[in-house]
Structure formats: C-alpha cells, structure tokens
C-alpha cells in the first residue's frame, strides 16, 4: 500500500501543478480580456493607461526578488495557496474598484501583481521538482497548461463581452473561483525537499560546456545573483517575456485602435495568439528533444519577429489576426525553457528560478506600460515595433540555455536534448 502511494504521488502532483498553472493563466487572461472595456470605462488615454498597467508590474517586480526566500520559508504548497488567494481577491478588487475610479484599480493591480509574482515562481519551482521526480521534461507542458487557462479565459471574455455581461460580476466570479480551486488542488503537491547545505551539489552554472561544471555546495541568494549563466538566462527570458507580455496586453487594442476591428474581434485576436502559444508549448517537447534547446529557441526568436512585423504592417484585420497567431508560436517556449534551465541543478533551483523570473518579469510586466507611453506619442502599432527590435537579442542569448549532458542533472527523456545541443 505504501508502495502504491509513493508511485502515484508524482502523478497526482503533476495534476495539481497543471491545475495551478491553468488557474494562473485563467486569472491573468480574465483581466487582460477586459482591458479595452476597463480603459474605456475609466476614460483614460493610452499614456495614462500605461501608467495604470505599471502598478501590476511594480507589484510583481517587488515580489520576485524575494520569492525564493518566501518559498523556502513557506514551502511551495503554502506559497501558492496564500498568494493565489491574494491574486484572486485583487481581481475582485479591480471588478468593483473601477466603478469608483482609477485609484482602487491601481491598488488592486499592485496586489494582484505581487501575488502572481510569488505564485508564478512557486509553481515553477514545484514544476522543476516534478520533472526530477518524473525523470522527464514536462515544464513546457505545464506552461501549456497556463496557456490553456489564458485561451479559455479569453474566449470566455469574448462571449461575455458580446452578451453584455457586467465587468464587476465577471471579475468577481473568476477571482473567488480561482482562489478556492487552487487552495484545494495544491494539497497533492510533492513534499518539500529537505535542504542540505553540507552535501555538495553539482554546479551547472558555467560559460563553458555544462559538462565542465564543478561540485560545489548549495549557493546563497546573493551568490546566485552574481552567476553569469543565470543572469544571461534571465536576460534571455526577459526578451521573450517582453514579446509575450506586450501581446497579451496590447494585441486587443492593436486590432481595435490600429486596425479598426470590433471589440469582440480584438479579444479573438488575443485568443489566436494564446491558442498558438498553447499548442506550441504542448507539442514543443518533441522539438526540444530532437533538435535541442538552442536550435529551437533561435528558430522561435525569428518566428516571433516575423509575427510582430506581420501584425503591425498588415493591411487588413484578418492578416493582422494571422500575425498574432505567428507571434504566439514564436513567443511560446522562451519562458518555460528558461525556467527549466534555472532548475537544471536541484541544489539551487529555487533561488535560480527566482532570479531568472525576477529579471524576466521586468519586461513581462514593465514592457506593456512602456508600449503605452510610446503609443501616446505615436500609435499602438508603431509602439509595438519595439518588440521586433529586441527579439533578435534572444537569438544570440539562446546558447546560454544549453542543457547539461550528465545524468545527475539531465531531465531530458533519453538524453536527446543534451546530445543535440552538444552538436
């Protein structure tokens, strides 16, 4: 009986992790799907709205640098429970706050951003732990679960907008529902790994081949912040997070204001981006196993560039819709593979994932407000060209995500990823 419980624990933990990722995506896209209506209801111009979005960025950025410490203290399970509840209640606050004015929305966005910041790091740390327990790469599929949540939320928002469902009721129902669902589902998370500062761990942070890594003890929070490879991976994630975050917050407005599309069509454009991102994340493991992290991520950086350019310069809303779909493919794997790279060494996974996420979220949440400020002096579509300008940086940084080749750190089923990247 004990054997059965032990063997099924990783499977149950996998399901619980999917639930946490899906819920995070559903909550985030519920907010994003209502952005055009909230902006209109508050009667704000693009520049001022960009400043409102900055509140969410500030919340996440202030949470992420210490998220690893919080998770070490509380454990992933309780970190997810507490901060998903905070995020859900903050969404309720947005739903009622916009009826009063911008100030309650700004406060609620800050709290939602803070909650999402810790929640995101915690589920990625636990996802890396599940990968080690399952002995195969599944992080991209966890992030596909996040995208499933975003697609479902975007489609739900499109339907509710079309039928005139109240914003406050929509956000309140989702906020409370997500908080309750996550609190219950994470009961099946894996037990916390006992820390051991005296046992040497395999160090994979190196600018050379990961096979040349040395055996060193577990690192401190500040030591991890000084690692060249970790910082390079963080910068890589920043580039892809900027592409993803800009799309989520501005594709709808880009279609409506830039391509003169109807409100529901703008939300469907966001759904197209999220749908292709989801499919690529779900099936991307096969590409990573066959061709390796570096080759796949470089190809996706180029794809994202093409998608942005098609979206911006499309002569019709229909072609812009296609550009949004291509953009979703290109932006799909950068963030999840970056999280996997941070968890390559289990000894320092929590701290490294926290650092990488901290760097990435500067763009993921701070980039969209920047687009708003630029749009105030030009247009939404012209401002989006900044994404096209920075995406090539990800192409050159992809080499830092090369997977370790040794068994002690490899999570790739059959070792294909390490073999491919070694070429």
Residue spans of the language-model regions?
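Helix-loop-helix hairpin linking two adjacent transmembrane segments in secondary transporters
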Residues: 100, 142-193
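Hydrophobic core of transmembrane alpha-helices in multi-pass small-molecule transporters
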Residues: 22, 90, 102-119, 320-332
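Helix-to-loop junctions at the C-terminal end of transmembrane segments
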Residues: 63-76, 161, 280-293, 375-376
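Short amphipathic helix-loop junctions that connect adjacent transmembrane helices
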Residues: 33-47, 249-265
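C-terminal transmembrane helical hairpin of 12-TM major facilitator-type secondary transporters
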Residues: 291-338
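Primarily marks hydrophobic transmembrane alpha-helices of the MFS/SLC 12-helix fold
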Residues: 77-81, 297
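C-terminal ends and interior cores of transmembrane alpha-helices
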Residues: 85-99, 303-315
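Intracellular juxtamembrane helix-capping segments at the cytosolic ends
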Residues: 117-133, 332-347
């Amino acid at each position: 009986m004990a054997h059965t419980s032990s063997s099924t624990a990783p499977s149950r933990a996998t399901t619980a992790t999917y639930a946490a990722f899906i819920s995070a995506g559903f909550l985030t896209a519920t907010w994003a799907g209502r952005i055009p209506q909230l902006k209109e209801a508050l009667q704000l111009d693009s520049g001022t709205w960009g400043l409102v979005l900055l509140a969410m960025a500030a919340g996440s950025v202030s949470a992420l640098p210490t998220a690893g410490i919080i998770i070490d203290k509380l454990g992933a399970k309780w970190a997810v429970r507490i901060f998903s509840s905070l995020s859900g209640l903050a969404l309720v606050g947005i739903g009622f706050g916009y009826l009063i004015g911008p100030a309650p929305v700004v406060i609620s966005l800050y709290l939602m951003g803070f909650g999402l910041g810790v929640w995101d790091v915690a589920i990625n740390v636990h996802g890396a732990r599940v990968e080690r327990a399952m002995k195969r790469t599944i992080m991209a599929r966890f992030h596909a679960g996040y995208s499933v949540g975003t697609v479902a939320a975007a489609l739900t928002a499109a339907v509710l907008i079309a039928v005139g469902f109240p914003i406050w009721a929509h956000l309140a129902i989702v906020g409370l529902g997500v908080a309750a669902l996550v609190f219950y589902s994470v009961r099946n998370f894996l037990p916390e790994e006992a820390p051991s500062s005296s046992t040497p761990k395999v160090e994979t942070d190196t600018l050379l081949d990961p096979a040349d890594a040395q055996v060193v003890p577990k690192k401190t929070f500040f030591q991890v912040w000084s690692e060249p490879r970790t910082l390079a991976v963080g910068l890589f994630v920043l580039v892809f997070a900027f592409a993803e975050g800009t799309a989520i917050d501005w594709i709808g407005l880009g279609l409506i204001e830039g391509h003169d599309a109807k409100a529901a069509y703008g939300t469907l454009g966001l759904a197209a981006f999220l749908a292709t991102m989801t499919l690529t994340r779900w099936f991307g493991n096969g590409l990573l196993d066959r061709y390796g992290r570096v080759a796949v991520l470089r190809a996706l950086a180029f794809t994202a560039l093409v998608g942005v350019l098609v979206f911006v310069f499309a002569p019709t809303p229909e072609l812009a819709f296609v550009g949004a779909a291509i953009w979703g493919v290109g932006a799909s794997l950068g963030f999840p593979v970056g999280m996997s790279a941070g968890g390559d060494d289990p000894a320092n996974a929590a701290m490294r994932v926290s650092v990488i996420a901290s760097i990435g979220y500067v763009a993921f949440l701070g980039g969209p407000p920047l687009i708003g400020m630029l749009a105030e002096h030009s247009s939404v579509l012209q401002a989006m060209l900044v994404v096209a300008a920075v995406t090539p940086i990800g192409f050159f940084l992809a080499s830092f995500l090369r997977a370790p080749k040794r068994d002690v750190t490899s999570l790739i089923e059959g070792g294909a990823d390490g073999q491919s990247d070694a070429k």
